[in-house]
Amino acid sequence: MNYETVIGLEVHVELKTKSKIFSSSPNAFGAPPNTQTNVIDLGYPGVLPVLNRQAVEFAMKAAMALNCEIATETKFDRKNYFYPDNPKAYQISQYDQPLGKNGWIEIEVNGKKKKIGITRIHLEEDAGKLTHTGDGYSLVDFNRQGTPLIEIVSEPDIRSPEEAYAYLEKLKAIIQYTGVSDCKMEEGSLRCDANISLRPIGSDQFGTKTELKNLNSFNFVRMGLEYEAKRQGKILLSGGVIRQETRRFDEATKTTILMRVKEGSEDYRYFPEPDLVMLYNDDEWKERVRASIPELPDARQKRYVEEWGLPEYDAKVLTLTKEMADFFXATVANGADPKLASNWLMVEVSGYLNAKQKELHDIALTPESLASMIKLIQNGTISSKIAKKVFKELVEHSGDPEKIVKEKGLVQISDEGALRKIVLEVLDANPQSVEDYKNGKDRALGFLVGQVMKATKGQANPPLVNKLLVEEIKKR
């Protein structure tokens, strides 16, 4: 029997408000342990939560960007469970009346577009953070306790790990564009749990699902789902039964490990939060929030294609993160040719960032300096090959491209008389290559160009070198 994979994702996103969702404690990453918490976060007797209006607006903004219907009335509920990082023994969340529902985003995998439904988006508070020492005890940091979160629950519309990866990339991009979160997985501001099951192809009944945790990167989400699909497939094909359970992805072995048998919602004994009143979202408030939503990835991608003539693939890559899209737009605004700017960002800049494991904001390169360098290529002052030397200087130390070119003697040689002399010397030194080219071996010309470039230390104007070589060979 053949099976298909059914996947749903639960994504938690921390909202970057200045204070926490129900208290005035600061909401910032990286502070010393237990320095950003107060009696409300810790649930001291007699204290009362006060809802952060900015958190609601950020959640509403994200929900609108994800095409959700915004509830006119919503409420908060207590989710009851005991764990050391949860000092109140309950979490304030939303159960049966979430802020947003019935949304969707469009993904593209292997050239095919597909809509993935979003069941709901709700607000809740984050828990603290446990650090296991390995010495028989654990440390608890309550700085994260009470941080405003949105949980984004997808429909079980995802059919492969590749689709899950594409969904997460698109979701992250949209959230970052709205400005409500930085979505840094390494800091925990975006976290993902995955639910996966198998069912016979053609069936409309869902199989028993497994929840996967400890998925600390999009690649680990993909790896965990790939492994779990194979594990469940082997069990089903051998006549076994899948248990509903929670499993942890092990980064070292690239396998999933049983954590616990899965709880149902009834295990949490939800009931309405008695210390918070019903929240009413009137039309005026909704429209004000909607008006604050900036241009989103799909719209920007379309604009880059229509206004600047970029290929769709280039536009898609450039708009995948807001930081890259903004950098590209600023580079073009400073006079760079859009296609050249796109090529440099997609190849040289992205290659450097990947090799160094850095982000754009970590390097010295600016849109102004990149545009200035590209304009030197456009006006023939330097070649693309020489530009790579200038780029290395800009990306590591910043500076003025024109000044760098002059100080390092990198100006492209475009003097026809000077180049013709070098061309003649190269032709005299390589008579066999000349004969090969005359006999139809085009690669011989490439060799001769390389010899001229070598003689000029890469500073000769390549199109002019080609032209002069062909002219002089014809004379022989």
UniProtKB/Swiss-Prot annotation:
Catalytic activity: L-glutamyl-tRNA(Gln) + L-glutamine + ATP + H2O = L-glutaminyl-tRNA(Gln) + L-glutamate + ADP + phosphate + H(+); L-aspartyl-tRNA(Asn) + L-glutamine + ATP + H2O = L-asparaginyl-tRNA(Asn) + L-glutamate + ADP + phosphate + 2 H(+)
EC number(s) per entry: 6.3.5.-
Highest taxon in the source lineage: Bacteria
Molecular function per GO: asparaginyl-tRNA synthase (glutamine-hydrolyzing) activity; ATP binding; glutaminyl-tRNA synthase (glutamine-hydrolyzing) activity
Claim: ATP-binding is one of the keywords in the record: yes
Keyword ATP-binding: yes
Disulfide bonds: none
Any one GO biological process: glutaminyl-tRNAGln biosynthesis via transamidation
UniProt keyword list: ATP-binding, Ligase, Nucleotide-binding, Protein biosynthesis
Record InterPro entries: Asn/Gln-tRNA_amidoTrfase_suB/E (IPR017959), Asn/Gln-tRNA_Trfase_suB/E_cat (IPR006075), Asn/Gln_amidotransferase (IPR018027), Asn/Gln_tRNA_amidoTrase-B-like (IPR003789), GatB (IPR004413), GatB_C_1 (IPR042114), GatB_Yqey_C_2 (IPR023168), Gln-tRNA_amidoTrfase_suB_CS (IPR017958)
Function: Allows the formation of correctly charged Asn-tRNA(Asn) or Gln-tRNA(Gln) through the transamidation of misacylated Asp-tRNA(Asn) or Glu-tRNA(Gln) in organisms which lack either or both of asparaginyl-tRNA or glutaminyl-tRNA synthetases. The reaction takes place in the presence of glutamine and ATP through an activated phospho-Asp-tRNA(Asn) or phospho-Glu-tRNA(Gln).
NCBIfam families hit by this protein: gatB (TIGR00133), PRK05477.1-1 (NF004011), PRK05477.1-2 (NF004012), PRK05477.1-4 (NF004014)
Subunit and partners: Heterotrimer of A, B and C subunits.
Similarity comment: family membership: Belongs to the GatB/GatE family. GatB subfamily.
Protein name as annotated: Aspartyl/glutamyl-tRNA(Asn/Gln) amidotransferase subunit B
Higher taxonomy: Bacteria, Bacillati, Bacillota, Bacilli, Bacillales
